[in-house]
């Protein structure tokens, strides 16, 4: 187990799911991953209107639209990298908690978050097919999983083997 979060982050401790960490290290690592995610998402909220491109009104190569999609490419890569790092961080913590199948439990939060993001993206484009209630249901599941993770791996200590 890493002695502190600084040691874990200093040797890039999110690169593998092997090992164990304590609740404090998990909380610090989650905040460490959550802050850039929040900043990148906030930037995307400001840039998202530029992704709407109507060729009847704007030229084919509108530089604002090109820059928006370049950022979207970077943002998508960052989202996937943060999800993988959080999976590795959580797998260590679930293993320390003594739950069976720590990899499956660690993957539940990133998977649900990615599905929620996809549903929020797809629903306005396919509103006739996908009701908003599906999106709300996925969001409710995401909130429940976040709450369960915060309580289970963020607050409780290690279980005795």
Give the predicted meaning of each segment.
Residues 39-80, 111-145:
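Membrane-helix interface segments in multi-pass membrane proteins
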């Amino acid at each position: 187990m890493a002695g502190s979060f600084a040691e874990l982050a200093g040797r890039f401790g999110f690169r593998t799911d092997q090992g164990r960490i304590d609740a404090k290290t998990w909380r610090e690592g989650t905040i460490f991953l959550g802050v850039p995610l929040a900043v990148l998402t906030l930037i995307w909220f400001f840039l998202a209107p530029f992704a709407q491109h109507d060729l009847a009104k704007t030229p084919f190569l509108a530089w604002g639209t090109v820059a928006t999609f370049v950022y979207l490419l970077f943002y998508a890569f960052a989202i996937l990298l943060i999800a993988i790092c959080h999976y590795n961080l959580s797998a260590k913590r679930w293993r320390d908690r003594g739950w069976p199948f720590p990899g499956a439990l660690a993957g539940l939060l990133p998977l649900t978050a990615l599905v929620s993001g996809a549903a929020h993206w797809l629903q306005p484009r396919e509103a006739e097919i996908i009701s908003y209630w599906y999106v709300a249901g996925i969001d409710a599941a995401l909130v429940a999983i976040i709450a369960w993770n915060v309580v289970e791996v963020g607050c409780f200590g290690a279980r005795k083997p």
